[in-house]
Every structure is written in C-alpha cells, then in structure tokens.
Amino acid sequence: MNAPKNPSTFHVKSFGCQMNVYDGERMAELMAAQGMTAAADADSADLVVLNTCHIREKATEKVYSDIGRLRKNARRGDRAAPMIAVAGCVAQAEGEEIVRRAKVDVVVGPQAYHNLPELVAQAARGSSALDTDMPAIAKFGALPARRRTGPSAFLTVQEGCDKFCTYCVVPYTRGAEVSRPFDAIVDEARALVDAGAREITLLGQNVNAWDDDAGTGLHGLIAALDRIEGLARIRYTTSHPNDMREGLIRAHAEVEKLMPFLHLPVQAGNDRVLKAMNRSHTRDSYLKLLDRVRAVRPDIALSGDFIVGFPSESEAEFADTLTLVDAVGYSQCFSFKYSPRPGTPAAEMDGQISPEVMDERLQRLQAALNRDQAAFNAATLGRRCTVLIERQGKLPGQMLGKSPWLQSVHLMTDARIGDLVEVEIVQAGPNSLAGIERVKAAA
C-alpha cells in the first residue's frame, strides 16, 4: 500500500540522547505549525518521523526494525502504510543507503530538519526526498516559536564536536562545534518560561564549549538566564572535562538557580585507554577537576559515561575504571559496551574485545555504579529539599518530581504540575525517593 498523499496526522519517535529529544519536540512543532495533528502512536499516524541515534550499532539496527514493523502493522490493519521520514544521526551517516535499503519517503539530517515540511510535501508528490546538508545551525531561525512545554524543558545552545574521540561518530553526524547566538538563546528561554517551564536544561554535544564573540562563556549565559523571572532551575549537559572553565565551576557556588548536578563523562579510568580514545585528559586531571567542583559546591551530584571493552583494554586497565568509580562516588551514570562505528579510527584498531568479555565487564561496572547510586540516594534520607512536580503518579493523590540532584521523588500532595514543594525524604530506593511535603514553595 502506498503512503498517504497528503498526511494529516504525524508521530515523532526519538531515539538516543537528550539532544534528540529536543530535536524531536521541534520537529513536532514544525508539523503542527503546518496544520497537522499529533497522533496517539506511530501505528495511527499518516506520517511517522523516526528521529535516530547512530552512537551504537544496536540503535541503528532498531531503526530498520521499526520501519519493517510499521509497514507490517499497516498491512495487518488494512490501512495505507504511513509516510516514513528518517531523521537524526542515522540519516546523516547513511543518507541514500537508507532510501536504497528501506525505501523510506524522507531522509533528513539533524542540521536540516527545519526543511521537513518541504521534504514531506515533495514525498507526497511521489518522489523520495533527502536533505543531509549541514549549514551552521541555520535551522533555529526557521523553527516556530515555543508555545507549549512541560515544567522541565530542553534548550539546545551548542551543537557539534571538535574533539574527535576515536570511537565517536558525532563529529561526522553533527558537524563542528557551533554555538547559538546569546540573544536567540535568551529569547527562547523566555518563551519556554512563558509557556510554562520552571526548569531549563541547556543542551550541547559539548555544552560547556558554548561561547560567543564577547567571550561570555557558558557561565555568563547561565548568569543571564538566572535573571529570567519565573525560571526556577537551570541545568546543562553534556560537558567535556577540557572545557570546564573556572567561571563555570564558580557558577555552581554563585548561581542559586543552577542545580547541584554535573554530568561529566570520563569513559575510562586508565591513562593508556584514555589516550587511545583521544580523550585529551588523564585520570588524574579528571579527578582533580572534580575536586575543584566539589570545593565550591560540596553537595553536588556527579554523573558520568563509561565505555567498557575499548579495543585492547586489558583486565588491569579495566580495573582502573572500577577504582575510579570507587574514588568518585557517582550519583548515577550511563555505561555501555564499546560498539565499533564505521569510519571511526577505533573500528580499525587491533585488539577488538570479545562480546563475552565486554558483557562480563559491563556487569561488574554496573554493579559498582548501582552500589554508588543506592548509597547516594540513602544519604538523602532525612534531608529536606525542593522538588519540582512534573507529573501525576500511579496512585490517587500521588505526584512525581525531581530533586535538585536529579533524583525521582514521589509524594502524596495536592500540589500541581509545575509547583515547587519542600519535601523531607523519608524513603530511599535504588532508583527513586519518597518524600513528605513540608512546605509548598512559590508556585
């Protein structure tokens, strides 16, 4: 069955990082601005946008699996197959190969999705449409104004990466580091607050590399956002250790709205492995950096990323990662098995590690990280903190929110979504906390 000639409903499914979540929201806003209606799910939509991730092979193959499932479900339901658009980093990396392999209607890269309405119109006329150009963040000027959001919102301020870690495809799929203009960011932040946001997370592949011609730096941008009335919380992610400047460290002590949470990936705990990854920092420099951050904000929660099984990583070198985890005491982390990506230097390195060894190492690493997370959560028992209410819970009268340290907190309250509530933590599980409302903060 052919795709609808003029799709009237759409569904955007995003894979991967928070940047993709932001991009997916913006694509949905684009289609809504064209008069289209958001469908409840992919199987009931005329247009399905798969906003993809290319970091690991499994994520890439999931896209092709989803395409097949969508078409199969359409045949079962005796309805026209949806128009399928593949967006994001898989689209950028594979381009015409996706059209050849999966016969999709639209392929659009992460720097060109502002052209999605025109590409959909082209596909509706009967020809596949592809756009993987990489203009320097021209898309932001073409996107509609932000009019709806939840209490927590993402805001992209920087894109691309110049670090060229040997395992990573981001420099090839997102391009070089580019910072959005200061005024455009502040204007979008104000629009988000006007639309209901109480918390904004600044996004970038290397968000702490953000800067402008005036040398404002991310700390200066955060200081400007701190002055926006109605904005209660500021966060930022993801950072690179080499771009963690003194001004940004001081901001964690000086800016009250900047939450005590820092996601700072390290990837490995051994210097030889870090050098092979082209991380441009050492184990010791990373640990000393964390000491500087903790010196100005002792209660800060630390998060990170880890890769196990990087080519030629020995058992002793992996053990260095475990000792680094013990030394830091993370509040939460992401950890993955190394996945060779075509075109990256690491994919051609000798000493590729077997899947069995990677599985075993990942289990040990995650056990250590889970212990740290449980210990961090347990340490909050009896503490009072402000919780931002984000959604309803499963029980009548139960609401869910986030602590300043990015922990999920559930509590019984009559507070509304978007309220700030002072809570005493009375129960700590491995993945969430329970609290009792003590004072309702400013609405």
Which residues fall in each region the model found?
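Proteins enriched for Cys/Gly/acidic motifs involved in redox and nucleic-acid/cofactor modification
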Residues: 1-210, 247, 262, 284-295, ...
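Generic beta-structure capping elements
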Residues: 15, 89, 135, 160, ...
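Short, solvent-exposed loop/turn segments at secondary-structure boundaries
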Residues: 59-61, 176-181, 211-216, 276-279, ...
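Conserved SAM/AdoMet-binding glycine-rich loop
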Residues: 81-85, 93, 194-315
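Short flexible coil/turn linkers enriched for glycine and charged/polar residues
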Residues: 148-151, 161-163, 258, 268, ...
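Conserved, mostly hydrophobic/aromatic
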Residues: 185, 202, 236, 264, ...
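Extended hydrophobic-aromatic, low-complexity segments
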Residues: 260-261, 274-275, 298-301, 316-318, ...
